[in-house]
Amino acid sequence: MSKEDLYDEGLDLAFEGKFEDAIERYRRALELDPGYADALHALAMAHAELDDLDAAIDAAKRLCELTPDDILAHTSLSTFYMRKGMVPEAEAESAKARMLDWKRQLSEQKTGGGGA
């Protein structure tokens, strides 16, 4: 099975509320490709759905290291920290996400207004 097939199966299982099974599929996809960001994010979200916030935070931190410019990764990590009561950490990740979004907006303004 390909990493994409495993990821897709995981999404289907998560949609059905079978988060433990989804986690197993995401982990198998990550065994095939440890840098598969979509599977890592889905893994974090599935752990969060089970209220396993330590595992969700661990996966989200790995995702942020893998994709440091991913706004959603930092936003998710911030949310997990907040749910765990780790307010300073949540605020720091939220600030990173806002800064990345501002940079994205500025970049779009620079490239969008010139007409190519």
Question: Could you tell me what each predicted segment is?
Answer:
Residues 15-27, 50-62, 84-96:
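Structural signature of tandem alpha-helical TPR/SEL1-like repeats
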